[in-house]
């Protein structure tokens, strides 16, 4: 790889030229990394709902043309000035949010919301110089959440790169750079269920099932899956879900249904849909005295959370979480180790595999609601 150090690399990338239109495979020029940046060779990437959301560009600032993608795994090709903890050949996961290690958030054991590198969906350039590292015929192609993994090579800030065990299979652990860690950490790091406890999971997509996986790992004895789509229930059993509730089957609020099932409420709940009614239900279904509800899903910008203050005074706790409260550089390597020592199972999240040339099929699968994670193989 050393022959490319300091040089512009021309490679294939799937470019989103405009909202909602199929990605186009293009030859792009990828500039060398600048100060505190790393250039990565992406080997595997997967598709997350966030990619689809910003590709559709409904309700946010459309930034096009851009290279989407943020769940991935690869190898360091070269490093920019000032980068000391990474070297060419290192196996890494790029992450959509970062850890500068210098700000108040990074120095706090309680936060992972880095002031410098926190996710910014509107920024299509590198923070170092306000320029893009991607171009076609000299014209810039914008970045996406600092990662842009739908390209054979990408440039990422060093603070958004987790160095991992080189023995870890990159085609499996790539899913840990976003959704799976988000759900897993919401349970293990924030809800913190104890062995033998009861947990309700609202929403049984990939993030919700990762939250269920966290409850399974923690030793919860009852894991109640809540979803409006009954076809998800069978698959959820693989992730430790023991019981299912479809709110459509009942005439009363689902929080009342769960309270009756569990002698007053579950010990913990994790909400992974982003629907405000589900968020309220997730809070109101936990037991008074000790119940903890954790919100993961991102709500509509106009949504308002309404509940009676007595629900708090009766000693219920409501928490929020971002990326499972994991610090990308410090914590994600240990999540990879959970997979390596067979504590965490990742294979069951991976339902499809496609070559890079067929990336638009991955969008079709997600739009149809088929499968959980589709791994896109960059090399033919």
Swiss-Prot record:
Its main location: cytoplasm. NAD(+) binds at residues 50, 203-208, 227, 232, 273, 296-298, 323, 373. It is found in: Cytoplasm. It is an enzyme of class 1 (oxidoreductase). Its cofactor is Zn(2+). PANTHER family: ALCOHOL DEHYDROGENASE, ALCOHOL DEHYDROGENASE 2. Keywords: Cytoplasm, Metal-binding, NAD, Oxidoreductase, Zinc. Homodimer. Homotetramer. This is Alcohol dehydrogenase 3. Zn(2+) 2 binds at residues 100, 103, 106, 114. Disulfide bonds: none annotated. It catalyses: a primary alcohol + NAD(+) = an aldehyde + NADH + H(+); a secondary alcohol + NAD(+) = a ketone + NADH + H(+). Belongs to the zinc-containing alcohol dehydrogenase family. Zn(2+) 1 binds at residues 48, 50, 70, 178. Its EC number is 1.1.1.1. One of its GO terms (biological process) is alkaloid metabolic process. An alcohol binds at residues 50, 70. One of its GO terms (molecular function) is alcohol dehydrogenase (NAD+) activity. GO terms for cellular component: cytosol.
